[in-house]
């Protein structure tokens, strides 16, 4: 079965008494802006891998009986949902933010999934989704590989302006790494950059959101790229030392994170150097004001891997900074020593995974953390990949809105993840009937929704696929607004007073996310 080559795409454990302190709540999602779907191509290896991988990983792709799923009257569904708001008030979680930020590794908060934590997971998932929704996938555009909008317009354009955060800096990574299918390049000779891709952003909570969540939260969102086929084909499965003890990480991930070249416009400094410079600046800025500061890093797929590398560096560099990672469909990144160092540094990691998604099984499809049971015989194996942190495992079969059968792209889609988080209560219950997040978002870049919903697949795109009719009646690609054209000078010269003014707002924040 053919696959698309591209995908659109911290809380400690607490005791039961903590659960009793955290009241239950309800909430919902927001609307987003359109963008071009990524280009697709087929892989000759997919059909040969499908059956063997599904059997090997026990992905449970068969259609189960629907006796455990609440029945839906599809004739009434549309009318009922159209009259139901997709938002709800945000609760003040300031007194419990340490629990929501993994002071106890989210114990007693994941199964059943606490309502407040569900909201926070989806919030950070939406931050990661923004890196796909704003990305220019169009290989016929001179701006392919860049963000469509400047950082001041990003959240507003995507419908995220009321989430309580402002973007302070964009992150760029080298596109000439050793995994050619992982990053996007324009087919045109004259482009905004021949060497770099937009890989995410750094943001910070405004005053109103800071009061609600109990601290000044810095967020870093990393963009993912490839579909499951390229994970299998392109991963070099080569562990490389991080420079600290015995810790090693996958070579390709480290290359994207650390590569730079003085001859480039956007990567005279690496993605690592860019993000750490900005995070350090923000931490110092708000600590000088006497504020408590946290760092939350998020990403999907490849973005989840980069988030873990970023967390490792931040925790190693900035003393006493609470660092958490919330990742979606992320692969294994490093060896056991890398995992242990993250633990010693105090990094809290929550991995959201879908049982049928193959990417979290890679690299280390066969040789992974399961071999630790042999440590008494073999000793610690430094070449074995291992996952990090707590896991929230989801199942596509739990949702009555999702099709059954094999769909690698849909299983790995971030929107599928967010839909399942919104409906998850615990491992034994059915899909949450009161879930309000718009199910249409699932089909933004895949074909996962049941036909009864009448939502077209891959519907999320620019009007007329980005073409406009000019004064002469000809359909052409429009020029970007000058402020949306990537500029390394605009990127480097951040107006700090303007940023501070931008995050001081007295507007009452209205909810954008589901719970």
Set out the residue ranges of the language-model regions:
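Alpha/beta hydrolase fold serine-hydrolase catalytic domain that processes acyl esters and thioesters
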Residues: 2-5, 25, 84-88, 94, ...
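N-terminal low-complexity, Ser/Thr- and acidic-residue-enriched intrinsically disordered segments
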Residues: 2-210
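Short alpha-helical scaffold segments that flank and stabilize functional sites
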Residues: 128-131, 310, 314
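Gly/Ala-rich beta-loop-alpha elbow adjacent to hydrolase catalytic centers
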Residues: 299-303, 307
């Amino acid at each position: 079965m053919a696959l698309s080559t591209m995908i659109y795409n911290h809380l400690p454990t607490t005791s039961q008494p903590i659960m009793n302190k955290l009241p239950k709540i309800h909430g919902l999602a927001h609307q987003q802006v359109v963008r071009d779907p990524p280009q697709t191509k087929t892989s000759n290896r997919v059909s040969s891998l499908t059956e063997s991988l599904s059997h090997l990983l026990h992905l449970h792709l068969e259609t189960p009986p629907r006796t455990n799923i609440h029945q839906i009257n599809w004739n009434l569904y549309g009318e009922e949902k159209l009259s139901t708001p997709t938002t709800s008030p945000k609760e003040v979680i300031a007194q419990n933010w340490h629990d929501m930020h993994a002071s106890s590794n989210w114990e007693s908060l994941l199964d059943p999934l606490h309502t407040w934590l569900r909201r926070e997971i989806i919030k950070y998932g939406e931050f990661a989704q923004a890196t796909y929704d704003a990305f220019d996938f169009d290989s016929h555009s001179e701006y392919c590989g860049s963000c469509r909008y400047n950082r001041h317009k990003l959240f507003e354009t995507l419908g995220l302006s009321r989430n309580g955060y402002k973007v302070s800096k964009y992150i760029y990574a080298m596109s000439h790494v050793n995994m050619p299918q992982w990053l996007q390049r324009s087919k045109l000779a004259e482009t905004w950059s021949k060497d770099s891709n937009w890989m995410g952003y750094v943001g910070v909570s405004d005053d109103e959101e800071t009061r609600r969540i109990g601290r000044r939260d810095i967020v870093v969102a990393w963009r993912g790229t490839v579909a499951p086929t390229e994970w299998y084909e392109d991963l070099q499965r080569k562990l490389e030392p991080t420079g600290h003890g015995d810790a090693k990480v996958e070579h390709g991930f480290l290359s994207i994170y650390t590569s730079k070249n003085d001859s480039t416009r956007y990567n005279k400094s690496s993605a690592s150097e860019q993000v750490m410079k900005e995070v350090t600046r923000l931490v110092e800025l708000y600590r000088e004001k006497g504020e408590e500061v946290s760092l939350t890093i998020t990403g999907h797929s490849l973005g989840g891997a980069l988030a873990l590398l970023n967390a490792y560096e931040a925790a190693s560099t900035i003393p006493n900074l609470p660092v958490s990672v919330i990742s979606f469909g992320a692969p294994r990144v490093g060896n056991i020593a890398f995992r242990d160092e993250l633990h010693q540094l105090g990094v809290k990691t929550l991995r959201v995974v879908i049982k049928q998604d193959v990417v979290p099984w890679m690299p280390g499809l066969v040789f992974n953390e399961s071999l630790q049971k042999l440590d008494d015989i073999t000793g610690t194996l430094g070449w074995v990949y291992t996952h990090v942190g707590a896991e929230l495992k989801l199942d596509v079969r739990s949702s009555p809105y999702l099709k059954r059968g094999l769909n690698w792209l849909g299983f790995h889609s971030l929107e599928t993840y967010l839909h399942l988080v919104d409906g998850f209560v615990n491992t034994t219950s059915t899909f949450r009937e009161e879930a309000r997040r718009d199910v249409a978002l699932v089909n933004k870049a895949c074909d996962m929704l049941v036909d009864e919903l009448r939502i077209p697949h891959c519907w999320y795109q620019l009007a007329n696929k980005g073409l406009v009719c000019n004064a002469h009646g000809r359909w052409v690609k429009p020029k970007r607004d000058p402020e949306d054209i990537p500029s390394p000078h605009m990127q480097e010269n951040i107006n700090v007073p303007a940023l501070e003014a931008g995050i001081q707002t007295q507007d009452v924040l209205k909810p954008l996310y589901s719970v």
